[in-house]
Swiss-Prot record:
One of its GO terms (biological process) is L-arginine biosynthetic process. This is Argininosuccinate lyase. Belongs to the lyase 1 family. Argininosuccinate lyase subfamily. GO terms for molecular function: argininosuccinate lyase activity.
Length: 470
């Protein structure tokens, strides 16, 4: 950064001051090197504002035409990477305005009539975030599609379901994956709901009180595709609820990714061995030649903490601000930008990684055969024979304890042995010769044949419904 560039910073407002800003303060307060990513949205908002000014007779049509010509050139320079961003011009808005004025003269100076950078930046952020939300919703759809494909391939694959990381009941792997489809579906719904509050136009609020020019805010809103305008000028320039709400929705997206990541890491570990992840998503060790590390899901877990931190940062940023705009709000952009980048990159890579997962059904089945996964089925069997559930629960617990001492599974006990160890006494005859049909893994999952259940038929129906909803 040259000394001459630094010396010029503040030209848009420096006439009020008796001494120049220090170089350190210039660097401390500038935002151009991160808010320049709003540039194309800044141009979009400015063109709509210029169209409104001309329509209302506030500027001449000739000025509007010059503004459009200049903005077209600036847009081309930015897209080609040839635009010169200057720290001395502080932010994205003044950089573009200065270049516009250099290109079209006084017409460029008239563009800022009836607006402030306060409502300008609020508009830019909303335009940018709206676009990013649309992208995130599409990426959530792609990830759900990948999960549905894998679930469809494994509608009959049985693995143990866990509570407290202890074997609980057998479920199908397809059913397990559908749980994440549900989570990411809710995430998409939250993003769409958040978008409604993002999609309001603050432009026209000016610095904080509105403007004395005869502007038409509804026209600008229509031009930019907003659903309506912010109804209070003070709130319009100071509101960052929409950014906080988005970050909360994004934190939930990452939380769901993190839960899935934890399972992927667990499933891939040699001690479990339920799946393998394609090599292109893993790394090795610089010292241990045998290692294949699931770095992508591990990093996703870690990045979730960063996104959660951005949410807390924005809440803290806003908690002590009086109305209306304060410079604190400049600090909203970097956490918001990083949240979007992290979520977008994560969803893209996971949508690509899921199809590369190799499932190991034999290992899943072997694990499901341990830990008495069908114990609840035996209790249900006794209830259907007329035994109260609590008595059935106790009887099966006795049987499990006997299996522990004999180092066997419930299905390994004969009918006579089950009757003996159940503690049911004269009611032990309720355990009939058909008891082993409920102690199979296939029988257990097939019995859960209702909406939301793990039966393969229900899993396939749920997959079809989820695909139709994409």
């Amino acid at each position: 950064m040259t000394t001459s560039q630094l010396a010029k910073k503040g030209e848009a407002w420096s006439a009020r001051f008796s001494e120049p800003m220090s170089d350190l303060v210039k660097r401390y307060t500038a935002s151009v090197f991160f808010d320049k990513r709003l540039a194309l949205f800044d141009i979009q908002g400015s063109l709509a504002h210029a169209a409104m000014l001309a329509k209302q007779g506030i500027i001449a049509e000739a000025d509007r035409a010059e503004i459009e010509r200049g903005m077209a050139q600036i847009k081309g320079e930015i897209e080609a990477g040839g635009f010169e961003w200057k720290l001395d011009l502080e932010d994205v808005h003044l950089n573009i305005e200065a270049r516009l004025t250099a290109l079209v003269g006084d017409a460029g100076k008239r563009l800022h009539t009836g607006r402030s950078r306060n409502d300008q930046v609020a508009t830019d952020i909303r335009l940018w975030l709206r676009s990013e939300i649309d992208n995130i919703i599409a990426l959530l759809g792609a990830l759900r599609g990948s999960l549905l494909d894998l679930a469809d391939q494994n509608a009959d694959t049985i693995l143990p379901g866990f509570t407290h990381l202890q074997v609980a009941q057998p479920v199908t792997f397809g059913h397990h994956l559908l749980a994440y489809v549900e989570m990411f579906t809710r995430d998409a719904e939250r993003m769409a709901d958040c978008r409604k509050r993002v999609n309001r136009l603050p432009l026209g609020a000016a610095a904080l009180a509105g403007t004395s020019y005869p502007i038409d805010r509804e026209f600008v809103a229509q031009q930019l595709g907003f659903d309506g305008v912010c109804r209070n000028s003070l709130d319009a320039v100071s509101d960052r609820d929409f950014a906080i709400e988005f970050c909360a929705a994004a934190a939930l997206v990452m939380t769901h990714v993190s839960r899935f990541s934890e399972e992927l890491v667990l499933w891939m570990s040699p001690r479990v061995g339920f799946i393998d992840i394609a090599d292109r998503f893993c790394t090795g060790s610089s010292i241990m030649p045998q290692k294949k590390n699931p770095d992508v899901p591990e990093l996703a877990r870690g990045k979730t903490g960063r996104v959660n931190g951005h949410l807390i940062g924005l809440l803290t940023l806003m908690k002590g601000q009086p109305l209306a705009y304060n410079k604190d709000n400049q600090e909203d952009k970097e956490p918001l930008f990083d949240t979007v980048d992290t979520v977008v990159d994560t969803l893209r890579i996971f949508a690509d990684m899921v199809p590369g997962i190799t499932v190991k059904p034999e290992a899943m089945r072997a694990a499901a055969l341990q830990g008495y996964a069908t114990a609840t089925d035996l209790a249900d069997y006794l209830v259907k024979k007329g035994l109260p559930f609590r008595d059935a629960h106790e009887a099966v617990a006795h049987a499990v304890r006997a299996c522990d001492s004999r180092n066997c599974d419930l299905a390994d006990l004969t009918v006579a042995e089950l009757r003996e160890v159940s503690g049911l006494g004269d009611k032990s005859a309720l355990i009939g010769d058909d008891v082993h049909t409920v102690l199979t893994l296939e029988g257990s999952v097939a019995a859960r044949n209702h909406i939301g259940g793990t039966a393969p038929d229900q899993v396939r129906a749920a997959i079809a419904a989820a695909r139709a909803a994409l």
